[in-house]
Amino acid sequence: MVKDNNSLVIKSGFMCGWGAGQDSLIISSTMIKYVYSVPANSQIPEINKARPITDTEWNNILNSINLNNFLNLNYNSCNICVDGCDEWIAIKNDAISHQIRFGMGIKIDSIKPLQDILSQLRSEFRN
């Protein structure tokens, strides 16, 4: 669990080779923003949405993060290098910044609760 930290920002997304598409989800203590684009089709995102985050949602996200576990993960795949897809998660605040990149759809046991929340948010914004 992360202690309530208003400077914390969680970013996640996916990117696929051959201009197939990419998205990003940016979560802070006040806002959730989602952008999805298919670079091969247009420079204009197909989806660009944002909404305020509730205190309950923010607390659920904070409770889903074991920061020590996340900081110890060392995933750095490059499926996009061979026209595949990679998923990424970055966590940053005033004191730390760490990012991992892994094969799209892979569940990592130590961060599965966070991955589940990010997946739910992504589904919400894509519909």
State each model region's role.
Residues I26-I32, D94:
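Short, solvent-exposed coil/turn segments at beta-strand boundaries
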Residues C16-G19, N41:
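Short glycine/serine/proline-enriched coil/turn segments at secondary-structure junctions
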Residues Y34-N48, H98-I100:
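Acidic/histidine-rich, surface-exposed loop or edge segments in extracytoplasmic proteins
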Residues W18-S28:
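Short, solvent-exposed loop/hinge segments that bridge or flank secondary-structure elements
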Residues I32-K33, F70:
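Primarily extracytoplasmic ectodomains and periplasmic/lumenal surface modules that are beta-strand-rich
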Residues G21-D23, I47-K49, C85:
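Residues that flank catalytic or metal-binding motifs in active/ligand-binding sites
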Residues M1-G17, R51, N59-L62, N68-N127:
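Short, well-ordered, aromatic-rich surface patches in folded extracellular/luminal domains
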